[in-house]
UniProtKB/Swiss-Prot annotation:
The organism's taxonomic lineage, starting at the top: Eukaryota, Metazoa, Chordata, Cephalochordata, Leptocardii
Location within or outside the cell: Mitochondrion
Superkingdom, natural source: Eukaryota
Family label: Belongs to the EF-Ts family.
Native source species: Branchiostoma floridae
GO CC field: mitochondrion
NCBIfam families: tsf
Magnesium found in the keyword field: no
BP term (GO), one: mitochondrial translational elongation
Chief location bin: mitochondrion
Annotated protein name in UniProt: Elongation factor Ts, mitochondrial
Keyword terms: Elongation factor, Mitochondrion, Protein biosynthesis
Stored InterPro entries: EF-Ts_dimer_sf, Transl_elong_EFTs/EF1B, Transl_elong_EFTs/EF1B_dimer, Transl_elong_Ts_CS, UBA-like_sf
Compositional bias per record (Acidic residues), positions renumbered to this chain: 276-291
Further comment: This protein may be expected to contain an N-terminal transit peptide but none has been predicted.
Length: 331
């Protein structure tokens, strides 16, 4: 029996209304805008972002929270599954504020992931969290501080309402590679005008800065250097630049100890040309295997040793630390 005309019209009207609601530019625009925002903010796939928005009726805040919770759960599961995979790549991060600094190493499996913004963000968060940990313990900064912390210790560090361990799991869930927080060096000298901490990062990642108070820099190599200003009469004293140059030497020449100051050289005018040449050859031979920093030829000026450079600048080298991403530590 055919349907009454009115019913047919009603069905057609409902279908038209459904089509109107489905294609309405305002509603469709809101969905697309939120989908784009959520995708850009979280980095998750469009499929997962749409699923989250549908689940919470386009509520961005709730959708983002749910996505992160799911990624973190998946990340912890992946972390357990991938924990035996080798992590030889990664980045070194250096954060500094005044006479306090921290240097961290976070590893991943491939250089491709090491260049990913999400991984860089994690390394920055680890570096800033460790610096915050130093600042949270004022008693540590009253004297000399040099403490190496393991990845297992660092995972427990709180950052906001989460931990570094949870952040790492979240990043593993997003990027799909084994990621390990390997180590962190806490470093500080007494906050007095004559003592300084210098920082240097080699092969820095574009868009990161280092060497300024409150900054964080990322790269493949890093160095922290502690030194004391002995002669306050020197003009144009630039502690940050001196620290950067000393750190560059540490990264490039890989000294093992500070060592002892070399003896003051004789005046060049008192030597014959032949004697000068012989001494230069002997100096070159010995410098190749020299591990005491003060006795090494200064990387940025081969005409002098590091010791002579510090004497010239009126400073005393106290200590240094060098990190190389992926290096094998001697047992």
């Amino acid at each position: 029996m055919p349907c009454p005309t009115g019913v047919t019209r009603c069905s057609a009207g409902v279908s038209s209304l459904a089509r109107c609601l489905h294609t309405c530019p305002v509603l469709e625009g809101v969905t697309k805008a939120n989908l784009s925002k959520l995708r850009k903010k979280t980095g998750f796939t469009f499929v997962n972002c749409r699923k989250a928005l549908e689940k919470f009726e386009n509520d961005l805040e709730q959708a983002e929270k749910w996505l992160k919770e799911q990624a973190q759960k998946e990340g912890w599961a992946k972390a357990t599954k991938l924990q035996d995979r080798q992590t030889a790549q990664g980045l070194v991060g250096v954060a500094q504020e005044g006479t306090m600094a921290t240097m961290v190493e976070v590893n991943c499996e491939t250089d491709f992931v090491a260049r990913n913004p999400k991984f860089r963000q994690l390394v920055t968060q680890v570096a800033m969290a460790t610096l915050g940990d130093v600042k949270a313990h004022p008693q540590w900064t009253l004297g000399w501080l040099k403490a190496l912390h393991t990845g297992e210790e660092l995972k427990q560090l709180q950052i906001g309402d989460t931990t570094l361990g949870d952040l790492t799991a979240l990043t593993i869930g997003t990027l799909g590679e084994n990621i390990q927080i390997r180590r962190a060096m806490y470093y500080s000298v007494p906050p007095i005008p004559t003592k300084h901490v210098g920082v240097y990062v080699h092969a820095p990642v574009a868009g990161t800065t280092g060497g300024q108070s409150g900054s964080c820099a990322l790269g493949k190599y890093g160095a922290l250097v502690a030194f004391r200003r002995k002669n306050t009469e020197f003009q144009n004293f630039n502690a940050a630049e001196l620290g950067r140059r000393l750190g560059q030497h540490v990264v490039g020449m890989s000294p093992l100890t500070v060592g002892e100051m070399p003896e003051v050289r004789e005046e060049e005018g008192e030597k014959k040309d032949g004697d000068k040449q012989d001494e230069e050859e002997r100096s070159t031979d010995s410098d190749e295997d020299e591990t005491q920093m003060l006795r090494q030829t200064f990387l940025l000026d081969p005409t002098m040793t590091v010791g002579e450079m510090t004497r010239q600048q009126g400073i005393e080298l106290l200590d240094f630390v060098r990190f190389e991403c992926g290096e094998v530590e001697e047992s």
